[in-house]
Swiss-Prot record:
Organism encoding this protein: Salmonella gallinarum (strain 287/91 / NCTC 13346)
Protein name, UniProt field: ATP synthase subunit b
An example molecular function term from Gene Ontology annotations: proton-transporting ATPase activity, rotational mechanism
Quaternary structure (record): F-type ATPases have 2 components, F(1) - the catalytic core - and F(0) - the membrane proton channel. F(1) has five subunits: alpha(3), beta(3), gamma(1), delta(1), epsilon(1). F(0) has three main subunits: a(1), b(2) and c(10-14). The alpha and beta chains form an alternating ring which encloses part of the gamma chain. F(1) is attached to F(0) by a central stalk formed by the gamma and epsilon chains, while a peripheral stalk is formed by the delta and b chains.
Alphabetical list of PANTHER family matching this protein: ATP SYNTHASE SUBUNIT B, ATP SYNTHASE SUBUNIT B', CHLOROPLASTIC
Length: 156
């Protein structure tokens, strides 16, 4: 092998080139590569965190939905109980009103019955007096008296 000055010069130039690249070119390239690796790692970590946050949000939403459904069920049950209570109160009130109206109607019927009896008594008394007057006027005849009494009984 022949070592001449050209090979030696090329070797020195290559070594200087490598040294220059290692000193001035390689560090910015490595910094850019490391920066990019860090950005990618941060992006992946951020995506993982976002995925976990999404899972937590889904779980939280599911829990809140279950709680909301339970609350809705409780509210519906309370509304049904209140509806039943209102219906019972309305039935009770209607029953009381019916009882009151029936009692009032019976009282009115009884009052009308008493008034009718009193009116009937007055008419009977008037008829009895009229019959007595006729009997007194015709008291001479026994057959006429029994005829007047029969007519009076028929009128009553």
């Amino acid at each position: 092998m022949n070592l001449n000055a050209t090979i030696l010069g090329q070797a020195i130039a290559f070594i200087l080139f490598v040294w220059f690249c290692m000193k001035y070119v390689w560090p910015p390239l490595m910094a850019a590569i490391e920066k990019r690796q860090k950005e990618i790692a941060d992006g992946l970590a951020s995506a993982e965190r976002a995925h976990k946050d999404l899972d937590l949000a889904k779980a939280s939403a599911t829990d809140q939905l279950k709680k909301a459904k339970a609350e809705v069920q409780v509210i519906i049950e309370q509304a049904n109980k209140r509806r039943a209570q209102i219906l019972d109160e309305a039935k009770t009130e209607a029953e009381q009103e019916r009882t009151k109206i029936v009692a009032q109607a019976q009282a009115e019927i009884e009052a009308e019955r008493k008034r009718a009896r009193e009116e009937l008594r007055k008419q009977v008394a008037i008829l009895a007096v009229a019959g007595a007057e006729k009997i007194i006027e015709r008291s001479v005849d026994e057959a006429a008296n029994s005829d007047i009494v029969d007519k009076l009984v028929a009128e009553l």
